[in-house]
């Protein structure tokens, strides 16, 4: 299924909201920008329901050759980490970790959403033209095996490459930056 803008938003929220511990659902997310508040709330609720959530985020320290201050991902990660949600940072060295992947799976079924959309209001609420693909099927299908292998190898730094670092490497508990992020997300005065 091809999804654009608001349809991506709706599908992502449905994916997260439908994940449950009784089905032994796992939710793996790799994302360049994460800032949209309803998605953050849904992730918190999924974690509290016992869904096994893992996230790989860009540390937002570099963008297009310029240094950044970590907003929004470090502030969002601080919120989610406080609930015990496992987070790793892409180990970037001037480049960006530009993946945008959400994979929900259990032993029987899987769902994959990937494409151009960051999880931000700008990307999901009809401000940018975005296109994602959504695939639903049996968990054993090759597309889900490939997506899972990509996430697991990035998470675990396998294949002889250091791809991610622990949350503590870029943790930022600054209240000033947190409230700056919240203002930027609310007002739209941001590049994310």
Regions found by a protein language model. Give the residues of each.
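PLD/PLD-like phosphodiesterase catalytic module centered on the HKD motif
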Residues: 20-26, 33-192
